[in-house]
Amino acid sequence: MRKPSNQLGNKMFIINCKNYDEIAGDKIIKIAKISEKVSRKYKVPIAIAPPHHLIPLITKFKITVLAQHVDDKKVGSTTGFMVPEIVKKSKINGSIINHSEHRISEKEIISLVKRLQKLKLKTVLLSHIHI
């Protein structure tokens, strides 16, 4: 399996699957296969951010897999949270942070960006601020 590049520049096509029925169950596999083919054919990096429970179905494909969200929690008794250190061990390449449907505080953003960088995970930071 090809390991996704850490140096993607500033261009990447990201498919955030949200929680739509069109990707439920094995349907996510079809999207991953198509994404892998398109990425290879057009030499464009593609990332898929499926609902967390579907991630294991697509980690075998040669695409970047992103968590839709991670939490600023520690490894241990944190049931129901997506912990960055566990995310890394689950063959996930990075995470979306601060999506408009899952906003977090500035303090959490700063902490998570630092943690993901330390873990060498991709960070897709979204903001509603226009610069």
Regions found by a protein language model. Name each.
Residues M1-M82:
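Conserved N-terminal beta1-alpha1 strand-loop-helix module at the mouth
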Residues I14, L66, I96, V124-L125:
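Conserved beta-strand positions in the central sheet of alpha/beta enzyme cores
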Residues V44, L119-L121:
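A short helix->loop->beta-strand "cap" motif at the edges of active sites that frequently abuts
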Residues I63-L116:
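Glycine/small-residue-rich loop that forms an oxyanion/phosphate-binding "nest" at active or ligand-binding sites
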Residues I129-I131:
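Conserved small/polar residues in nucleotide/adenosyl-binding loops
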